[in-house]
Amino acid sequence: VGLDMKIDALVNMWGETAEICAGAPQAEYAAALAAARKHYLTPQAKEADIVIANSFAKASEAISGLMVAFPSVKPGGDVVLIANAPDGQATHYLMGPFGNSIAGKLQLQMKVPDNVNRLIIYNEYPEIASGRFLEDSEKILMMEDWEKVKGLLKQSHGPVTKVAVYPDADIQYCGGIN
């Protein structure tokens, strides 16, 4: 039994449906891909003192927002990942960790790049699973109070600070995809 129809929805930064593509699978896929490339394409910020990457659409897989954030920060800059997921991070059975010493066959452990001063992971619902997708580093701070996040950034950065904000970094992309 094959598919005779496929439906894809593109969402906006509030999680609302912004566009729907439907039709025969191959034709619909091509149309949805073309629409998604335009819809989610984002100019890449460069040399920002602070990069704020909100993972909203896939808050339970927040780490994906760092792929847009890390290339945007200048040496010595800070990255803030908003991983505000009340249910915590999803168990990823192929790439995720299971405790301290067991993981999926393709375990993903992202390294905080050398040029990043701090990676602040903000989640008002404290949990430790967010950090398990990252190599251990003293650069990583887990914070649950947004006012304290802002206070820490203000201490480190002066009044003339270049800030890049990705409102939905987990589904945005910065070119380079054919």
Residue ranges and their predicted role:
Residues M5-I7, A32, V51-A53, L119-Y122, ...:
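Generic structural hydrophobic/aromatic packing signal, biased to beta-strands
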Residues A53-I63:
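Short, glycine-rich nucleotide/cofactor-binding loops
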Residues A32-L41, I63-A69, K105-Q107:
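Glycine-rich, charged/polar anion/phosphate-binding loops
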Residues G2-L10, L41-A48, V79-N84, T91-H92, ...:
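Flexible, glycine/charged-enriched surface loops at secondary-structure junctions
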Residues V1-E47:
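Conserved, well-structured core segments that form the ligand-binding/active-site neighborhood
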Residues L66-N178:
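C-terminal non-catalytic interaction/assembly regions of soluble proteins
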Residues A22-Q26, A45, I63, I140-M143, ...:
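Electropositive phosphate-/nucleotide-binding environments in soluble metabolic enzymes
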